[in-house]
Amino acid sequence: MHQEIENYFIMNFVKIIQSQPTNCLRDTFYMAKITLFVRGFRLFPIFAGVFLTKVKSKPMKIQFFAGTLLCCIFASCLVGCSNNDDSIVIAPEADASQFVVLTDVVPDVILEIRYYSTYNFIGRRIPGYDEPIAMLTRQAADSLKKVSDDLIKQGYRLKIFDGYRPQKAVDYFMQWAVDINDTLMKQYFYPELDKAVLVPQEYIAEKSGHTRGSTIDLTLFDMATEKEVDMGCTYDYFGVASHPDVQPGQAIGAYKPITQEHYDNRMILQKAMMDHGFKPYDCEWWHFTLDNEPFPNTYFTFPLTRKSLEAQAGYSSGKF
């Protein structure tokens, strides 16, 4: 049934966009990338083919653009119904049985849960973050305890920005990404980028390693100065400055070049994490995933609250 509806929609939508001027199609083409990028490009060749057949250029009609945006969103929903990945498992909403509250296992960490606050790239508290706590799978928390113990010997504590992230939060990110007019925090988190490219360039995606429970966002806190260590750019900055392998002095746009001190600080964090089984992410200096994560294909949905864990038999302060 979904396939029949999708085919009918495609035929009629192509007829509509074939009658539109090139400038209008250019924006249609771009919006299609945003809404369909993570769906596997199943409709993308259609938009591309029609776009390439147009040669005239006229001002875009606002009414058509608005209608096209709605059509793109509708198409994205239809494709999602028929493009399920059998390797992905969505856990039951109440299933938090393999998770712990991070501070129960690693009491020395400092918490700054950005998505519980309004200081994040959206500017609002994110759904699913019901309490300002961090959770991880037991395996990831145990490994992070070893990282923390090693870094304390070097004069550092770990500062946590995010751990387990409910799927509803990721869904909210995607909804926000489609609304290209909501740019409240642009000057702080993506000043160099048009919001429309955040999904195509994979700064935001439908699925996140955080939702599997063994990914952590964090930085270093200097115990001597009692300040967060300077890594050269802020957490959740969308841009080249966030790449951990940016070299000292390399031009990176709006941010001042990374200094040798910034680079060295990033490497202190990266080495400590890798020494205890975490792998870095090449686009974010703060992001690490347990290499041998226990749920590589399972995405969890329970909210971030102690009640999620207290409902599990035998849970008490992180010990089963």
Task: Identify the residue ranges that each predicted region occupies.
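Short hydrophobic targeting helices and cationic amphipathic motifs
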Residues: 3, 8-9, 13, 24-25, ...
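N-terminal hydrophobic alpha-helix used for membrane targeting or insertion
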Residues: 4-7, 12, 22, 72, ...
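Extracytoplasmic cell-surface/polysaccharide-interacting catalytic and binding patches
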Residues: 46, 81-163, 170-283, 295-320
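Short, Lys/Arg-enriched alpha-helical microdomains
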Residues: 292
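Conserved metal-phosphate-binding beta-hairpin within the catalytic cores
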Residues: 288
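Bacterial Sec-dependent N-terminal signal peptides
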Residues: 37-90
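Cationic, amphipathic, low-complexity segments that mediate targeting or membrane/lipid association
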Residues: 10, 20, 32-38
